[in-house]
């Protein structure tokens, strides 16, 4: 159990520049491998797709790793702020995961429990704070960010070829349609 007074509150600085892609990274609480199972990964992919439709943003690349997620998104409207996108992605996954753990693996909840000084208790799925957020303001940088995202499972030794990792957009960029989530292919500067 973690006491809230023992935790330094992390804050993500966000610059919601209209017409600017965002490279986002966020992690599981205490870097626990909470995204190692297909069930939880599918919840995340479902949440990505729902948030994309709700907040009107393009998803150019993603990868789901066992304890963190990388995204490259492009907001199509001023309403698609980073805070809204992240809440729309993270909240449904956390709620489903905590409910599932309560019903099936309650011992795991202890690792995710945080007690506030007031005595209020909560269970964390995601690391506190928003994670990493960078505006990608140069079009020439976008393909490099996509490649970096796709190579995560290769660098970790989970696969030898990026497109072999099913929880990534790498296979989509190779032209495969049998993917977990179809992304909005980056084909140069947005119109």
How would you describe each model-predicted region?
Residues 1-191:
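Short catalytic/metal-binding and nucleic-acid-binding patches
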């Amino acid at each position: 159990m973690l006491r809230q007074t023992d935790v330094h509150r992390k804050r993500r600085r966000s610059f919601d520049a209209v017409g600017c892609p965002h490279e986002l990274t966020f992690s599981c609480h205490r870097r626990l491998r909470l995204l190692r199972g297909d069930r939880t990964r599918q919840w995340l992919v479902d949440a990505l797709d729902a948030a994309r439709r709700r907040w009107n943003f393009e998803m150019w690349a993603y990868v789901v790793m066992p304890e963190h997620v990388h995204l490259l998104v492009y907001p199509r409207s001023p309403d698609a702020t980073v805070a809204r996108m992240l809440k729309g992605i993270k909240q449904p996954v956390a709620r489903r995961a905590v409910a599932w753990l309560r019903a099936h693996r309650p011992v795991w909840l202890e690792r995710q429990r945080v007690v506030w000084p007031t005595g209020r208790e909560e269970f964390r799925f995601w690391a506190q704070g928003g994670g990493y957020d960078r505006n990608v303001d140069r079009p020439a940088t976008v393909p490099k960010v996509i490649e970096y995202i796709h190579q995560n499972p290769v660098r970790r030794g989970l696969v030898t070829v990026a497109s072999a990792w099913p929880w990534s957009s790498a296979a989509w960029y190779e032209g495969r349609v049998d993917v977990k989530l179809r992304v909005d292919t980056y084909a140069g500067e947005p119109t």
